[in-house]
UniProtKB/Swiss-Prot annotation:
Record protein name field: Phosphatidylinositol 4-phosphate 5-kinase 2
Disulfide bonds: none
Encoding gene per record: PIP5K2
One annotated Gene Ontology cellular component of this protein: plasma membrane
Cellular compartments annotated: Cell membrane
UniProt region (Activation loop), positions on chain: 710-731
MORN repeats: 82-104, 105-127, 128-150, 151-173, 174-196, 197-219, 220-242
Length: 754
C-alpha cells in the first residue's frame, strides 16, 4: 500500500518542476577551426520524480522518509536520455546520460551532479576519463583529443592545472606544471627530433631560466623571455668548448669564448608559422659559431609556441656574407651585389577594384570550404575516389546557406574535383591544412602574374610564395584527372620525384558568367634565396629564346633554351640521383602520352665566401681554434662533403634534409658560349666553349607543364612547323621522342663534378 505524501498538492506540483542544471561547455575539437580548451558541454539533468519537503503544523513535524534508490531509463522532452540510479529525486550513484548531439557521460553521480569517477565522450572522438566534482572535470584524469594528443594529470574546474604530462600527435612530449591549460612553472619539453628543453615556463612559452640541449651534445643554458634567449647565458659544444655572454635589448649577444677566441654573437630569429621561411636576422659578430634559431608557431591552446632549429636550418634565414678581415677572422657584412634592398616580387597584388578581385574572393571562399569539409573524413582512398566524375558542385549565395557562410562577392558555384585524393596528396607532400588555408585564404591578397608562355593562363601567387594557382583549360583538367591514379602512385613510390606537386583542382562559375578552372600547386621557387636567373628548358631550339633585349632581362624574366649559357656541375651522388629520377619521371610522362613539358631551373649565385648561407664550413669546425679558421679555404670539395655530412646529421636527427633533389642544391655554374645553334644540343655537341668562369650557386629545379598530351592539335602543329624548321628542333613531337630528347638534353647541361 503506497504511503500518501505529507505535502499539499500545490507543493507537489512545485516539486515536480525542479530542474537541476550544471551547465558549462567543452569545445569539440575540429581540425584547425577551433582551439582546444577543455570545458564541460551542456550537462543538463531533469528530475524525474517530485522532491518531497517536510511541513510543520504548529508544533507537529511530519517527515517523509527518503525513498530507496531506483534504476530508471527515461527519455527527456529535449531528446536526451538518462539511464541509471535515482535517489531522493536526484541521479545518485551510477548512471549514463546521452545528449541528442552525441555527447555522453557515464559514471558516478551525487545529488544530480557528476561527481566521482566517470568518462565523458564527444561526437568528434575526444574523451575524458577521470575524476569529476560538482559536474566539472576536477582531480586526476586523462584527456585524449581527436587528433591523438593525450594529457594525463591534474584538473581544476575543467582546466589542466597542476602537474601533468602531454604527448602530442607529432611525437613531442611535455611533462611539468600547468596553469589554466598552459605550461606554467617548471617543465620539460622533448621534441621528436631529440631536442630537449628543461626549465621555466610562463603562459605556455619558455620564460625564465632553462637549458636547451641538442642530440649532438651541444647545449645552451641561460635566461629566456617569450621563447627566445634574453639575459645571460652559456653555450657549450660537445667537445667541451664554451662561451658566456648576455643578450641585450638591441638583440645582440656579446659573448666571451673560453678557448682563445674573443667575442662573437648568438643569432636568434623568430618567425610566424603562417609566414613560410620568412625569418630575418642581423649578423655583426667577428666569428662563426653554431646558431640557435627559435621559430614561433601558432600552436594549439596549451601548446608551446616555439620550435627549435639547429645549425644548418638556421643558416638559411640570414642574408649576410662572410669576409676575412686582416687578422684572419671572418666577419659578416652585407652583400652589395645580391642583397641591396628588398627583392623584387613578381606580379600585381589583387586589391579591391582589381578586375579579378571577385574571382580571388570566390577562390578563397571555395578553398576554405573544401579543406574544412573534408578534414574530418578519415578513411583509406577507394578506387571510386579517383573517378573523373567524382566532383561536387556547391552554391555560394551572398547571403549564405546552411553549408556556406555569407560573403561580399557575387553569387557563384564552386566545383571540387576528387577532393579526397588531393587531400591525401597534400598530406603526402606534408602540407599542413591550416597553413594551406592561411596562405591562400588569409588576410593577405594574392598576386597575379601573367603567363610567361603562349597558353594565356594566369598565375596567382600567395604572399608567402608557397603556393601557385594557375588557370587552366578544360582539356588540361581532363588530362590531370585521367592520369591521377598513375600520378598518385608515382609520387608515392618516388619521394624525390621532380614532377609538379598538385594540391587541388577546382572550378568557379559566377551566376551568368563563364567557368574558370584552376589548379593549385607548389611554387618551385619558394626560397629564402633570391632567384637571380630562371630558365624554362625543353631540349628543343625552334623559337626557344627570350624576346627581351639584354638590358631588360631581370630576376623575373624566364629565359629559354637558346638563352642558356651555363653548364651546372653537381657532386657525383647528386648527379647520379638526378639522372635516375629524370629517367623515372620521363618514363611516367611518356606512358601517359605527355609532352611539351619543361625543366624549370632557378639559380642563386653565391660569392666565394658566402658559406654561411648553406650552413657549411663555418659550422663544421667546433674547436674554436684560430688556426682552424685560418687554414680552412672553402674548397669546393669541402663544400660538397660538408653539405652531405650535415644533411646526414639532419636525417639521423629525424628532421627532413635541408638539401634535397631539386631544392637548395649546392652546385657550380660554369659559363659557356651562348647556345645559338641547335646542333650543339645534339649528340655531337658536347664540346662547349668554356669561358673559364665558375660560380658557386644554389639550384632549384623541377618538371612543369605536364598536362599537355599529344592530341590532334599538337600533331597538326608538328606537321605545320616541320615545313618551316628541322622536325627534331620543334617542341611538338611524339612523347617517346620528346622524352628521349629531353633526357639527353638534361644529361648535357648537368655535369658530374669530378
Amino acid at each position: 500500500m503506497m504511503r500518501e505524501p505529507l505535502v499539499s498538492e500545490e507543493e507537489e506540483e512545485e516539486a515536480t518542476e525542479v530542474l537541476l542544471v550544471e551547465k558549462t561547455k567543452l569545445c569539440k575539437r575540429r581540425g584547425d577551426e577551433e582551439k582546444t580548451e577543455e570545458r564541460r558541454d551542456d550537462l543538463l539533468l531533469l528530475a524525474l520524480t517530485p522532491m518531497v519537503r517536510s511541513k510543520s503544523q504548529g508544533t507537529t513535524r511530519r517527515v517523509t522518509p527518503t525513498p530507496p534508490p531506483v534504476d530508471v531509463e527515461k527519455p527527456l522532452p529535449n531528446g536526451d536520455l538518462y539511464m541509471g540510479t535515482f535517489s531522493g529525486g536526484f541521479p545518485n550513484g551510477s548512471g549514463k546520460y546521452l545528449w541528442k548531439d552525441g555527447c555522453m557521460y557515464e559514471g558516478e553521480w551525487k545529488r544530480g551532479k557528476a561527481s566521482g569517477k566517470g568518462k565523458f565522450s564527444w561526437p568528434s572522438g575526444a574523451t575524458y576519463e577521470g575524476e569529476f566534482k560538482s559536474g566539472r572535470m576536477e582531480g586526476s584524469g586523462t584527456f585524449v583529443g581527436v587528433d591523438g594528443d593525450t594529457y594525463r594529470g591534474s584538473w581544476v574546474a575543467d582546466r589542466k592545472q597542476g602537474h601533468g604530462q602531454k604527448r602530442y600527435a607529432n611525437g613531442d612530449y611535455y611533462e611539468g606544471t600547468w596553469r589554466r591549460n598552459l605550461q606554467d612553472g617548471r617543465g620539460r619539453y622533448v621534441w621528436m627530433n631529440g631536442n630537449q628543453y628543461t626549465g621555466e615556463w610562463r603562459n605556455g612559452v619558455i620564460c625564465g631560466k632553462g637549458v636547451l640541449a641538442w642530440p649532438n651534445g651541444n647545449r645552451y643554458e641561460g635566461q629566456w623571455e617569450n621563447g627566445v634567449p634574453k639575459g645571460s647565458g652559456v653555450f657549450t659544444w660537445a667537445d667541451g668548448s664554451s662561451w658566456i655572454g648576455s643578450w641585450n635589448e638591441s638583440s645582440n649577444l656579446m659573448r666571451n669564448f673560453f678557448d682563445g677566441i674573443e667575442k662573437n654573437e648568438l643569432i636568434v630569429a623568430t618567425r610566424k608559422r603562417s609566414s613560410v621561411d620568412s625569418g630575418a636576422g642581423s649578423l655583426t659578430g667577428e666569428k662563426i659559431f653554431p646558431r640557435i634559431c627559435i621559430w614561433e608557431s601558432d600552436g594549439e591552446a596549451g601548446d608551446i609556441t616555439c620550435d627549435i632549429v639547429d645549425n644548418v636550418e638556421a643558416s638559411v634565414i640570414y642574408r649576410d656574407r662572410i669576409s676575412i678581415d686582416k687578422d684572419g677572422f671572418r666577419q659578416f657584412r652585407k652583400n652589395p651585389c645580391c642583397f641591396s634592398g628588398e627583392a623584387k616580387k613578381p606580379g600585381e597584388t589583387i586589391s579591391k577594384g582589381h578586375k579579378k578581385y571577385d574571382l580571388m574572393l570566390n577562390l578563397q571562399h571555395g578553398i576554405r570550404y573544401s579543406v574544412g569539409k573534408h578534414a574530418s573524413v578519415v578513411r583509406d582512398l577507394k578506387q571510386s575516389d579517383f573517378d573523373p566524375s567524382e566532383k561536387f558542385w556547391t552554391r555560394f549565395p551572398p547571403e549564405g546557406s546552411k553549408t556556406t557562410p555569407p560573403h561580399l562577392s557575387v553569387d557563384f558555384r564552386w566545383k571540387d574535383y576528387c577532393p579526397l585524393v588531393f587531400r591525401r596528396l597534400r598530406e603526402l607532400f606534408t602540407v599542413d591544412p591550416a597553413d594551406y588555408m592561411l596562405a591562400i585564404c588569409g588576410n593577405d591578397a594574392l598576386r597575379e602574374l601573367s603567363s610567361p608562355g603562349k597558353s594565356g593562363s594566369f598565375f596567382y601567387l600567395t604572399q608567402d610564395d608557397r603556393f601557385m594557382i594557375k588557370t587552366v583549360k578544360k582539356s588540361e583538367v581532363k588530362v590531370l584527372l585521367r592520369m591521377l591514379p598513375s600520378y598518385y602512385k608515382h609520387v608515392c613510390q618516388y619521394e624525390n620525384t621532380l614532377v609538379t606537386r598538385f594540391y587541388g583542382v577546382h572550378c568557379i562559375k559566377p551566376v551568368g558568367g563563364q567557368k574558370t578552372r584552376f589548379i593549385v600547386m607548389g611554387n618551385l621557387f619558394c626560397s629564402e634565396y633570391r632567384i637571380q636567373r630562371r630558365f624554362d628548358l625543353k631540349g628543343s631550339s625552334h623559337g626557344r629564346y627570350t624576346s627581351k633585349p639584354e638590358g631588360e632581362i631581370d630576376e623575373t624574366t624566364t629565359l629559354k633554351d637558346l638563352d642558356l649559357n651555363f653548364a651546372f656541375r653537381l657532386q657525383r651522388n647528386w648527379y647520379q640521383e638526378l639522372m635516375t629520377q629524370i629517367k623515372r619521371d620521363c618514363e611516367f610522362l611518356e606512358a601517359e602520352r605527355i609532352m611539351d613539358y619543361s625543366l624549370l631551373v632557378g639559380v642563386h649565385f653565391r660569392d666565394d665566401n658566402t658559406g654561411d648561407k648553406m650552413g657549411l664550413s663555418p659550422f663544421v669546425l667546433r674547436s674554436g681554434k684560430i688556426e682552424s679558421y685560418q687554414s680552412e679555404k672553402f674548397m669546393r670539395g669541402c663544400r660538397f662533403l660538408e653539405a652531405e655530412l650535415q644533411d646526414m646529421d639532419r636525417i639521423l636527427a629525424g628532421r627532413k634534409p635541408l638539401i634535397r633533389l631539386g631544392a637548395n642544391m649546392p652546385a657550380r655554374a660554369e659559363r659557356m658560349a651562348r647556345r645559338s645553334d641547335y646542333d650543339q644540343y645534339s649528340s655531337g655537341g658536347t664540346n662547349y666553349q668554356s669561358h673559364g668562369e665558375v660560380y658557386e650557386v644554389v639550384l632549384y629545379f623541377g618538371i612543369i607543364d605536364i598536362l599537355q598530351d599529344y592530341d590532334i592539335s599538337k600533331k597538326i602543329e608538328h606537321a605545320y612547323k616541320s615545313l618551316q624548321a628541322d622536325p627534331a628542333s620543334i617542341s611538338a613531337v611524339d612523347p617517346k621522342l620528346y622524352s628521349r630528347r629531353f633526357r639527353d638534353f638534361i644529361s648535357r647541361i648537368f655535369i658530374e663534378d669530378g
